[in-house]
Amino acid sequence: MNFKAIVTLFFLTILTSVSFSREVISFNQNWAFKKGPFTTDLLQYGNVFSGTWQSIAVPHTWNSKDMQVRNDRFTSNEKFYVGDAYYRKTFIPESSWNGKRIFVKFEGVNTNTEVYINNSPLPAKKEKGNVVYDASAINGNYQIVGRHQGGYSAFVLELTNMLKFGVENEILVKVNNEATPQVIPVNHTLFPMYGGIYRPVELIVTDKINIAVSDYASSGVYISQKDINKKSASINLKVKLENKNHDARDLQVVSTIFEQNGAVKAKNIKKYRLLPQGRQEVMQDFNLTNPHLWQGLEDPYLYKVVTQLVDGNTVLDEVIQPLGLRKFELRTGEGFFLNDIKYPMYGVTRHQDRWGKGSALSNADHNEDLAIIKEIGATTIRLAHYQQSAYFYEKCDSIGFIVWAEIPFVNRVTTLEEANAKQQLTELIRQNYNHPSIYTWGLHNEVYTPNAYTIELTTKLNDLAKTEDQYRYTVQVSGYNVINHAVNNNADIQGINHYFGWYNGVIRDVDKWADQISKDFKDYKIIFSEYGAEANPSHQQEVVGDVGNQWANPAFFPEEFSTKFHEIHWGTIKRHPIFLASYLWNTFDFATPITALNVEPRNYKGLITFDRKLKKDPFYWYKANWSKEPVLYLTQRRVIERVNEITPVTVYSNLGTPTLLVNGVEEKNFVIGETDVHYIFQNVKLKEGDNIIQVKASSKGQQFEDKITWHYLKDNPKAISKDGPKSNKNEHIGL
């Protein structure tokens, strides 16, 4: 059989299965929305559901704009709405679905959700972007389908026995984004809890005999890898099955591993008698020879695993999952090894919101973030501090990023959140089990007192993670800035968040700290899990000190301090192999419920602005250090107005030694800074008025150039003060 025939047969198989077994139907359009506060519960009987509702599509958050409103004092953002809101949608279940199973899958609803079905919805009509419901009718026929607590993981509810087929039904979703002591995160000050159905929704229609849909909203197929090398790979599939018929059925579970060109790599057929009670598991083993390994960004090769549930010649159900064959290993004091090859862990973190949209992001938004992260040269992403979009994990698989995935057990505890933390960890692992990009499960981040409770719960979460997935690492993160704290070291890896010069000490303290832990904890697996400093591009300062201005009133976050901070921190990290990986905080500015005077309500520690339009100077510092793409960049390009006649000029160049021209005259006096891409030209003299700063370099016959203009006056009324603060006694409190 030729290549074209193989590919055609493969895709015909897929199309046949989709047409006659499982159907997955987008459920994103034609929703109506109403936000509180409400004086009475809308679910009470009566005509309170009548009137005008906003016509919307999901993904949707009601906080897409009010999170951006600036307050006039350092406080919580009082304009940010938290409370109840409702979504409703009418739809007609097809008559052909009668006798099948019907599920609704929500990928993300923040935070507490109740779902109802109504078989006799109110009459309605659309008017100018709204949906108007008939006020003359009584509408109280709502039956509860189910509830979900937690705003970041997917959940599935079965509608099968609650629908009327061939006529209009209505689904109603009640959402509340208030903090509750039983649901993590219990503290909503670190990042905003955007309320709404902010990720896609879909209907799933299956046969009565099916691969499990509602196993914590997972695929129902779990692919485990062991003994992975260039010569062979051992694969185990666990397939969870359900039979809602009244009799047992003799079936075949057929799992096929396909190459990217459609050729069959391996196939396993297992006969199984499926009983009509409970959820049952079928195990299938594969031993592959000469596997094509998943090698991160260098070669993110993905097989496709197609699992079919077959009755005679009929495919009852089918699930398709990715397979990237790889082995992760963290070697203490050496680094991260991917398939026994040392692999650089250039790490960034990412929150899932952006200007004007909040958390209701499109695939195009995710793609833009991924493209920026790839541009900077990052190899690994910490998706903080919660489960993120399924699409984002899928793209990390196909691009080749190494991923740290975690639950939102952050900052504070109530001692009432244990059950929900376990639920969200189980959801995270089962829903993302098959992503080859994920190397570790995050258990907590900066969780403070009480110590005994935090230790106990973290230990339980670690045990749970190891029960769910014995093939990946677990990690916990400390905000106490020390390794040997009682709360630490209850997972495979200890992450440390430390912000030298921002929340405590001076920037250079990072050197002494790294030296000390390298000596005292040489046998520990340690990751520098967060470090960063705020940088507002509208705040510029010619010379900065050794500490930041995080508590300045009004707020003043000069970009230059962040640049200095990152130069020193990355230089230290690079020199200390005790750090098996590191993650700068953050790739992008993100919103925060805590606001400061004279700035928007957000955290400015990102290397890129909240709208993704401006890349700050530190972005190019990392790009020059990490990326294989050519970088030639002059820093302080936004400090145009200057008062220092004699000044350094900093250039980032991964092209070798650059040539610096100031007003056409070459400057030759330079030193190498924190790394070999860091060129600091010293004692450069400016003239009164405009100064043209130009840098040139060449590589492989190609010429590169960067140019900026500075305006110098001895008594420049537009310039910021010459110097910054030298000391700081404030401590990190988890903001």
How should each PLM-predicted stretch be described?
Residues 19-21:
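Boundary at the C-terminal end of the N-terminal hydrophobic targeting segment
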Residues 157-163, 284-300, 681-684:
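Signal that preferentially marks extracellular ectodomain short beta-strand elements
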Residues 299-310:
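Internal, hydrophobic beta-strand segments that form the core of beta-sheet-rich folds
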Residues 25, 29, 34-38, 65, ...:
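Accessory beta-strand-rich segments of carbohydrate-active enzymes
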